[in-house]
A protein has these predicted regions:
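C-terminal substrate-binding/active-site "lid" region of AdoMet-derived donor-dependent transferases
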Residues: 168-219
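Conserved SAM-binding motif I beta-strand of class I
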Residues: 116-121
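Conserved SAM-binding strand-loop segment of SAM-dependent methyltransferases
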Residues: 137-147
């Protein structure tokens, strides 16, 4: 696994997006790792994976979400559901190195909440990095599983699902069919948004900006409101 990240990566960002993206990336991702002494900000291209798990061809390479997106989206759902928020499990589909789980845990501690947090990641090496980053936080369950092999009971409890463009349309359709409870979808970099909209979802809130990392939508199923 390639763990190198440095000045050349920032130069590439600058060349494509100007100064704005390197600044965002440093404060949203790189500095976060430095302050928390963890490893989440380095992306992992498909060609750099050490192994090819089930449905590897359907997956998208690893990249960390921005801090502000993770915090903003969960706080919006919290505000919408108010006292009912405590009933939801928080589930990151394609949890990678565990950044979303890490920030969720801090958010729950801040608000004195005890929601169950679950991360589902099909790549073993990324799951192992997440485990080290999370340092055995006792309110987080990590599952090294492909979405198709994830037990049905995970999808039978009310949940808030976080997806950072983890896979293509085929797996999204399978995922939608598997959910059997009241839920919200937080979709960061929503490449296949229309697949959700075509399956009876509605947009609760959204945001679009200069880079896909800042694009997100919050969705819910119309007939489960």
């Amino acid at each position: 696994m390639n763990n190198h990240f440095g000045i050349n990566d920032y130069k590439k960002m600058f060349k494509k997006y100007g100064i704005k993206l390197p600044v965002y990336y440093f404060f949203e991702n790189h500095l976060f790792d430095i302050l928390n002494k963890i490893d989440t900000h380095k992306r992992l291209l498909k060609s750099e994976y050490s192994s090819k798990p089930i449905n590897f061809n359907e997956g998208v390479y690893y990249m960390a979400s921005f801090n502000s997106v993770i915090k903003k989206t969960v706080s919006i759902v919290h505000a919408l559901e108010s006292e009912e928020f405590v009933k939801y499990n928080l589930i990151d589909i394609g949890s990678g190195k565990g950044k979303v789980l890490f920030i969720w845990s801090k958010y729950l501690n801040k608000h004195k909440l005890q929601n169950k947090i679950i991360g589902i990641e099909y790549d073993l090496e990324l799951s192992e990095i997440a485990s080290r980053n999370l340092n055995n936080k006792n309110n987080i369950q990590l599952l090294n599983l492909d979405i198709e092999n994830t037990p049905d009971y995970i999808f039978e409890e009310d949940a808030i699902y976080y997806l950072y463009n983890p896979f293509g349309e085929k797996i999204i359709k399978f995922f939608i069919d598997k959910i059997n409870s009241k839920h919200f979808i937080i979709y960061n970099n929503p490449v296949h948004l229309n697949t959700f909209l075509d399956n009876n979802y509605e947009i609760v809130k959204n945001n679009y900006d200069f880079h896909p990392n800042l694009d997100w939508v919050i969705l819910r199923k119309k007939n489960l409101i």
